[in-house]
Amino acid sequence: MIHTVLFDLDGTLTDSREGIVNSVKYAIEKLGGPMPDQQTLLKFIGPPLQDSFMEYCGYDAETAARGVDIFRERYVPIGQYENMAAPGMKELLERLKARGYVLALASSKPEALCISICERFGFTPSMASVTGSPAGSNGDKADVIRSVLDRLGLTDADLSTILMVGD
């Protein structure tokens, strides 16, 4: 039986396409690279940004890391606000919590941004944990999920009671 539900943020709890795509475009323009098509730009949503810059723009690790820094120049003050909650999501989280489910966020997005976004949309009161990538990490999703499980006091023996919603 499921007792704990982990949610991803981008594309699950929120529609963050506009802010992410606009910030990726900003970074690519600043780096002087050719602009990928819209379908490719949408692939930046979800995975760690450095990996996406390397895969979809052909950047080496150093250039991709600069791309992430430039992305954040725009995303932190502007892009995170070009975002909206999925319709009915706050109410859904409240209902799930009221039914006894333990809810948590697990995102490869930096944790400070996860906290800010969850607070803005009113998700935080429903969450037992809001967990993102630590500052300076590469945003590995498996590491984030392990961190959430540790924060919730869950072990491998509990895995059959956990559901992940999103990527």
Each language-model region and where it sits:
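Active-site neighborhood of HAD-like aspartate-dependent phosphohydrolases
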Residues: 1-43, 54-57, 61
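Acidic di-acidic motifs
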Residues: 16, 166-167
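Conserved donor sugar-nucleotide recognition element shared by glycan-biosynthetic enzymes
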Residues: 20, 49, 85, 138-141
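Metal-dependent phosphoesterase signature
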Residues: 54-90
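Short, acidic loop-to-helix structural element flanking the phosphoryl-transfer center
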Residues: 77-105, 111-115, 142-143
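Short beta-strand immediately N-terminal to the catalytic nucleophile in serine-hydrolase-like folds
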Residues: 106, 165-166
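Substrate-recognition "cap/lid" segment bordering the active-site pocket of phosphatases
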Residues: 112-163
